Amino acid sequence: MLGLRDVCFDPMLSSYDYHPISLMSTVPNDREIVQAVVDIWRKDKATEKLGAAKLTGLVKLTHSDWQLSEKRVKTVMKAANLGLNQEKFCYAGSIMSHATPGLDMPEKVTLNIAKNRGKGLYAKKDIKKDEELWNEQAFLLVPPLEHVGIMRKGMGCAFCSRPFQSHNGVECPSCAAKWCDNQCKKKDVTHVAMWHESRHGKVTRVEWRAFEDFCVENGWMALYALGLLWLRVIRDPKKDEVQKQMMAFARVGQDERHKAVEQSNSLFASEQSEVLWKKGYEMLDKLLLDTEFSYEKDFLPGLGMFNINNVDGNMYLTQSHLNHSCEPNVDVKNVGRTQGISVRAKRDIKTGEELFTTYVNPEHQLDDRRYNLRVNWGFNCNCTRCKREEREEMEYLDELVSNWTIEHKRKEMKEEKKERTRTRTRSVHFDKEPEVVA
């Protein structure tokens, strides 16, 4: 939905007809109605939440001579792409996920799968505030795209991308790659496909570099991560388990996620996205010649999977089961590139309570949090905090409308009093001689 700064009232550019305003008119034209509503919104931003009935009432307060119905206000505002409280698109119902195979749960945590809520982690025992529930290393470690250059020059670890402070490091005898230590070297199961010319790995260095360059040029982290993930499926000694675990992550098509972007985005922008997706698919599909990899079933859901599951660009098996609350009871901290994350209790947690993290900055306001969650994770948050703040907002709006009504009535009464005074003054005449009564 358009914001106030997007509204244009130039009659040459307006999408609705403009008619000259008649001073005696009691039926407002579309432009007048839109302007009246926008004036109310500008007076107090909170009024953007008002429904058509209350908004129509406020308009008629300041334009008492207008013949205006709630239905007409709705129609006019919708035509101007300023729909009132129109339902926002959410894609949470399209997200698919499964129980993760081979997952060792932390001692005090259990995994439950509910029909209406999906996967979630719950306290199996009482948990004390600040207690560490678990720590885990990344299932998929994705180097920042800005580190690709230093990795290629041997100035950063070929696995974790950490820049070297000196020229020390474990060198590859066959290429320019270096690792922090033997631990990083051992974990780097995709190295041959990414750096060497060998064909036995099904992917060559030249093909991978072309794909990598495309990701860097377009700043496309999700595509880069998806490429790394499928290289693991091809190269990892435990590739069957890796693929099953990959498919268990919550998944949704990137095209479905894109629908949640505000209506103010143009059709042209959507078409541009689709062109880029198809080019990205072609680049990745070239790497996976002997692998079944489709645009609709693997590529688009793969992009969506990374976007809704990554934490600072990396993916974690256990952490991915945590659901969101704007008042989380656990804290997920990034310990380091190779150390992974640590999950601690923010408060005492009772047995049976669900564990919640936060997907967004809890310092943000209600509207900002909900917008971020709807666009990036597909749902409209109704956690305890959001419901409480929404109630408070509605109470404020009711009070605001009431105060505006009282204020307007006072002004009307004041004007009526002035008019009566003027009328009485005009009715007194001093130009006639008084009559003498016999």
From Swiss-Prot:
Residues 107-360 form the SET domain. Residues 409-438 are annotated as: Disordered. It catalyses: L-lysyl-[histone] + S-adenosyl-L-methionine = N(6)-methyl-L-lysyl-[histone] + S-adenosyl-L-homocysteine + H(+). Its EC number is 2.1.1.-. It holds the Pfam family SET. Residues 409-419, 428-438 have a biased composition (Basic and acidic residues). One of its GO terms (biological process) is negative regulation of gene expression, epigenetic. InterPro entries: SET_dom, SET_dom_sf. It is found in: Nucleus; Chromosome; Cytoplasm. Keywords: Chromosome, Cytoplasm, Methyltransferase, Nucleus, S-adenosyl-L-methionine, Transferase. GO terms for molecular function: histone H4K20 methyltransferase activity. Its main location: nucleus. Signal peptide: none annotated. One of its GO terms (cellular component) is chromosome. It comes from the Eukaryota. PANTHER family: HISTONE-LYSINE N-TRIMETHYLTRANSFERASE SMYD5, SET AND MYND DOMAIN-CONTAINING PROTEIN 5. Belongs to the class V-like SAM-binding methyltransferase superfamily. Histone-lysine methyltransferase family. SET5 subfamily. Histone methyltransferase that monomethylates 'Lys-5', 'Lys-8' and 'Lys-12' of histone H4 (H4K5me1, H4K8me1 and H4K12me1, respectively), thereby controlling gene expression and remodeling chromatin structures. This is Histone-lysine N-methyltransferase SET5. It comes from Yarrowia lipolytica (strain CLIB 122 / E 150) (Yeast). The lineage of its organism: Eukaryota, Fungi, Dikarya, Ascomycota, Saccharomycotina. The gene is SET5.
